[in-house]
Amino acid sequence: MSSSPKPDWVRAKAPVGPTHARLKELMKQYSLHTVCEEACCPNVGECWGSGTATFMIMGEFCTRACRFCNVKSGKPNGMLDPEEPAKIASAVKDLGLKYVVITSVDRDDLPDGGASHFAKTITSVRTLAPDVSVETLIPDFGGGLKEIQTVVQAAPDVIGHNLETTEPLTLKVRDPRASYRQSLEVLEHVKQLDKRVFTKSSLMLGLGEREEDVLRTFRDLRAVGTDFLTLGQYLRPSQRNLPVIEYIKPERFSYYQRAAEQLGFLYVASGPLVRSSYRAGEYFLHRMIKPIT
């Protein structure tokens, strides 16, 4: 465990600005959740200040309990807000967003893991805000291929699914129901269903991973056709979560970025404060996505 104080390079700016305030007000108005707040993302100030947000659907309680995550774990008992897809679409339109990320808690209590709710949300956003590019960050749906197909058929521009860590650390870091190989299969199946959909994954560093395992993870992701990759520093959100083993220096993130780019990823974001939806709508990604929509 790292006993050193948090270095300057992982200290984020406090959220400020009129766009941030307006977005926070809209979230309350529509009774919506953002992963920006629920997961204590360090970039909430930067992203909300620029009018970008990641919406978290299907409630605030996750049926899993990954040891890195700050989202509440509990029993949603099959409950879903049927108006949520329309609420998110209205919020996206009201904010004038051009790029939206939709993620969720895990919902193992639902027959389809919430795949149909994902699809309804994507369709609602497309209907009300047709010019918006849509990225989804999906759970593994228990490995259900039919559920993955449901999301793919709703035609998001990007489908992300996070490995989170290297294979040797997966049992320590993720919920026991998650699997490194199953997550790779999720990403592979998306590509098999529709090669036009960009796929994306993310890793946290600083949990005690070995360099050779990180590089092997890059190769595993490319082997299943993953297009985009993000790498960021794990930051302990609370005392009940895993401790930080190491604060990775910025130059090490640069090294990993170069290594990933050499393997053929179309886009790599690598840095201490990078998260899976970090600057997801930035110009480079937007240019790549729009021609296929």
Each model region followed by its residue ranges:
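Short coil/turn segments at secondary-structure boundaries
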Residues: A53, I57, K75-E83, D109-G113
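Auxiliary Fe-S-binding modules of radical SAM enzymes
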Residues: M1-T54, M58, N70, A86-K93, ...
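Short pre-active-site segment immediately N-terminal to redox-active cysteine/selenocysteine motifs
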Residues: M58-A65
